[in-house]
């Protein structure tokens, strides 16, 4: 086999490993760990853990998307891209853009909004309970109804959190479609 062929095989393997690793991480963080931690930890502890994990998670997602985009862009003649190749480049660029928005803009604002929210909750003796463990009227709902500042802080947090979640789902979908396309190109197992 030619030396260039070996290098081409290595590049393909790196591309597949980085893409599948990123997608696996995204699936775990998005659909497993967050739900498990939310149901198992006190509310403010959950927030603290997420505030430490998410910056790394978003930056790793951003780095993986950048590596895959660079690999793919360098391996194709731009004038002769097939529909699938152009789609894959677009999906990886979308993933890079969404991960960058999350890492550099949304995550810091979401975390800052969470800390502001938790400050008010701590003043009221809230945040130490595991979600779903409280009996009786919801103290957070009562606080929202009585304290307009808290209600505004909560809206701000959920605005950033919602945008961050949409960006994250966009990354998961983009990488998943890239993996599906690669799987469809496999000739045999």
Curated annotation (Swiss-Prot):
Localization per Swiss-Prot or TrEMBL: Membrane
Membrane topology: Multi-pass membrane protein
Pfam families listed in its UniProt record: DUF4149
TM region(s), chain numbering: 18-38, 53-73, 81-101, 166-186
InterPro entries: TMEM205 (IPR042623), TMEM205-like (IPR025423)
Family, per entry: Belongs to the TMEM205 family.
Taxonomic source organism: Homo sapiens
Predominant localisation class: membrane
Name of the molecule in the record: Transmembrane protein 205
GO cellular component, one term: membrane
Free-text tissue specificity from the UniProt record: Widely expressed with highest levels in pancreas, followed by adrenal gland, thyroid, liver, mammary gland, prostate, kidney, and retina; lowest levels in skeletal muscle. Overexpressed in cisplatin-resistant cancer cells (at protein level).
Function statement: In cancer cells, plays a role in resistance to the chemotherapeutic agent cisplatin.
Keywords: Membrane, Transmembrane, Transmembrane helix
């Amino acid at each position: 086999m030619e030396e260039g062929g070996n290098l081409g095989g290595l590049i393909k393997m790196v591309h597949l490993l980085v893409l599948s690793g990123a997608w696996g991480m995204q699936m775990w963080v998005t659909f497993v760990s967050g739900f498990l931690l939310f149901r198992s930890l006190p509310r403010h502890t959950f927030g603290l853990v997420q505030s430490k994990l998410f910056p790394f998670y978003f930056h790793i997602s951003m780095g993986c998307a950048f590596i895959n985009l660079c690999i793919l862009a360098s391996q194709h003649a731009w004038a002769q891209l097939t529909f699938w190749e152009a789609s894959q480049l677009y999906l990886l660029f979308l993933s890079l853009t969404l991960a960058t928005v999350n890492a550099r803009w949304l995550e810091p604002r979401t975390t800052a909004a969470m800390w502001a929210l938790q400050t008010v909750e701590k003043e009221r003796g809230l945040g130490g309970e595991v979600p779903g463990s409280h009996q009786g009227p919801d103290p957070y709902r009562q606080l929202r109804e009585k304290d307009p500042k808290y209600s505004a802080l909560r809206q701000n947090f959920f605005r950033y959190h919602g945008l961050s979640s949409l960006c994250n789902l966009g990354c998961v979908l983009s990488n998943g479609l890239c993996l599906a396309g690669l799987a469809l190109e496999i000739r045999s197992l």
